[in-house]
Amino acid sequence: MAISTPMLVTFCVYIFGMILIGFIAWRSTKNFDDYILGGRSLGPFVTALSAGASDMSGWLLMGLPGAIFLSGISESWIAIGLTLGAWINWKLVAGRLRVHTEFNNNALTLPDYFTGRFEDKSRVLRIISALVILLFFTIYCASGIVAGARLFESTFGMSYETALWAGAAATIIYTFIGGFLAVSWTDTVQASLMIFALILTPVMVIVGVGGFSESLEVIKQKSIENVDMLKGLNFVAIISLMGWGLGYFGQPHILARFMAADSHHSIVHARRISMTWMILCLAGAVAVGFFGIAYFNNNPALAGAVNQNSERVFIELAQILFNPWIAGVLLSAILAAVMSTLSCQLLVCSSAITEDLYKAFLRKSASQQELVWVGRVMVLVVALIAIALAANPDNRVLGLVSYAWAGFGAAFGPVVLFSVMWSRMTRNGALAGMIIGAVTVIVWKQYGWLDVYEIIPGFIFGSLGIVIFSLLGKAPTAAMQERFAKADAHYHSAPPSKLQAE
């Protein structure tokens, strides 16, 4: 494919803008707290959109529309499950985690929080959770870099190797320079770009076909199963698809946004903004794939690339329906989705190494400036390892990413949820829940019992492990109980104004 000058220019302007935000954030980064959590200063709007953008990777604009285009509306169950899971996460975890991390030694990372919350003097929780984050997020990063490279490769006709570096460079630069603030501010811009693309594109597709009723009729004529929500699905399959929503409770890059909010009271507004954004984006992505069926059915001569790879449905519609300048902006939304998730994961890996390994075990007396620079160097190191893994897109290691969502959800999800909801939880309960949840996911995926998505049994057994081992062992210390009570009381305290009341 020949390089389109308008698309190249819009991509370059977009990337330059992200790097510029990184430099602006650099001026606001004074210490390690700023670099890792933005000094806990995010307002509700940035908290909301940053959480959304860090969650939704290229899957939102490629994977989901492609699945709907290929199989019809029945593929939207996963979107319903994700929406419910995200809402429950915002409702039960977000505000509480913001408070509890502050009350437990002002924890900057999940491993740091687990150590303080359960008074883990052995630091086993810190080591295990930090290593799990490093392993899976490095592979997650590699997977994101592959997605960005594929976009550059297909859009500009670059070689894969050139596309690999072009796609990763900008994200690495602004994350390296600006840290958490750069990542959160760019996430906000990227989330805005994503929702713009996912609202405008399906509207133009419907107009291109001749209207909503006409589009629906064409889709039904092609196959009535396209509009059947239960097509080929039984109860177990629907539960498995909706079970993806359980993953939200344990995703470190999303939970970090809650920890960075300026107040637990602002979480209420952030939840409303984020859920509105998420519902509109998921509905738009479903609509792109769904109405794309009608468009390409009416224009079979244009359907070659989509028939070969259904995940190109958004890309092809953007290039066909819009002039190259607008198409460039819309396709930048895919890059935005990839970059927003990648930058968050790079920063989580960097913080795990710097806070939970370097500072905790090697340099307890390290200065704030030293920690900031170690954090920056670790962003670079993790990125280079991820690029090395991504150099061969068929690398079998990348297959481990399929474990990551379920693994984090089952290993960390119940631990996070119980830690902010149940004062009787102990260190042994947390350790048992983490190990049982993770092992269940690995074993269940290998054997595929009952065809249930492995996060569901992992979450259930992990939760049971927490309750059983917490009740069997010694009760939490008086200090732990008191700290929990104070944090819980603070969480339930009245907001500063009635405007913030739920």
Task: List each language-model region with its residue ranges.
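Membrane-embedded helix-loop-helix hairpins and adjacent transmembrane boundary segments
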Residues: 1-502
